[in-house]
Amino acid sequence: MKVRPSVKPMCEHCKIIKRHGRVMVICSANPKHKQRQG
């Protein structure tokens, strides 16, 4: 999980979601692409 000031999709499998008021990126193809804003 990367914590970044700005989260962007890294590939076509990345999805931007909002959990508990935090913007996150989840990726089914590559788990390294997981990101959280903060």
From Swiss-Prot:
One Gene Ontology biological process: translation
Molecular function GO terms recorded: structural constituent of ribosome
Keywords noted in UniProt: Ribonucleoprotein, Ribosomal protein
One Pfam family linked to the record: Ribosomal_L36
InterPro entries listed in its UniProt record: Ribosomal_bL36, Ribosomal_bL36_sp
GO cellular component terms attached to this protein's record: cytoplasm; ribonucleoprotein complex; ribosome
UniProt similarity note: Belongs to the bacterial ribosomal protein bL36 family.
Protein name: Large ribosomal subunit protein bL36
Organism encoding this protein: Lactobacillus gasseri (strain ATCC 33323 / DSM 20243 / BCRC 14619 / CIP 102991 / JCM 1131 / KCTC 3163 / NCIMB 11718 / NCTC 13722 / AM63)
Organism phylogeny: Bacteria, Bacillati, Bacillota, Bacilli, Lactobacillales
